[in-house]
Amino acid sequence: MSGWKLGLDGFVTHFMVSGPQEEPYFNEAKDKNQLRYEAYLRSVIAEHKPVGETGEILVGEKSRLNEEWKYYYDSGSCFVNISTFYSVMRRIHFDIATVLETSSDIDVTAALWSYAAVDVYCNGRLEGALKQPVYKPIQKKELTLHLKAGRNLIYLACENLGVRDTRSVAGLQILNHKDEIKVSIPDEACADAAAVAEAFLESARLESNKLCFDSPAPAGTSYTYRYHEEDFAKAKIPAVWYQAEGKNEILLENGQPYVTVKVVLGKLELKRVFERTEQLVPKYALREDGSAFSFEENKELIFRRIANVMSES
């Protein structure tokens, strides 16, 4: 393939990601103020160890973090987002890699966006960094990427403190020479398959009670109505996937507000989630005869449901 164009406002939107690598974190410092304590921990957690030799960056192969490299796809997003919630403290590492292609040597001004601490390397050379993670707002740092004619490996080494709702988010925005740059991924052999799968998923659209595609679904396409299960016990139950290979449309069940479509091509796995807003309706607790519960009866029902969830998990 000839490479992708930059996304909205010059953002790079095609990456490979490894991680997160998570390990227990402990610090002897103490503070009665929770937010001040977390801010202190973020100020000291980043190690900024030199990346050194990255080796071949291939889908399915292990990175320097001993985590698999994956192609990252999140329809319409300008950022890599692998955020999650941590009930105990963790030291988090994740790596992001992309390739910028140009026909001549140019110095490009870029903006790095992240809540994490990030070291940015261009062809193995450290070009800039965000020194420590933050809770909010997102950080922005401008830096210069010295691009050579041909393929240039851009490598983001990210570190974060995992505590409560943790924003493991990063993005790279090109501010000049936008028309002179194409984007690819380090694993050239997977780039064509990624482009095919992504183009198929981007063509999908909701029409009434159907999900329609511009072309027949490729081999390895399936879908599920599972998206995000708030009940931890139910979340452990494997999702049910239905085959969609060769279909131009999928007839969707009523009462299912979310549908996730997955395409697997070789080692690549891309997913896109669709929300059916009209299917998001209140669920009322009613007696068998259809009458409503009183306030006190409804409150007891809520408490019993909470107790059941906790006992199951």
Regions found by a protein language model. Name each.
Residues 102, 107-121, 154:
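Aromatic-lined ligand-binding clefts that engage carbohydrates, nucleic acids, or primary amines
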Residues 83-93, 131-136:
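Extracellular beta-rich ligand/substrate-recognition surface
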Residues 1-77, 153-214, 220, 228-231, ...:
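Accessory carbohydrate-binding/adhesion or oligomerization-edge regions at the termini
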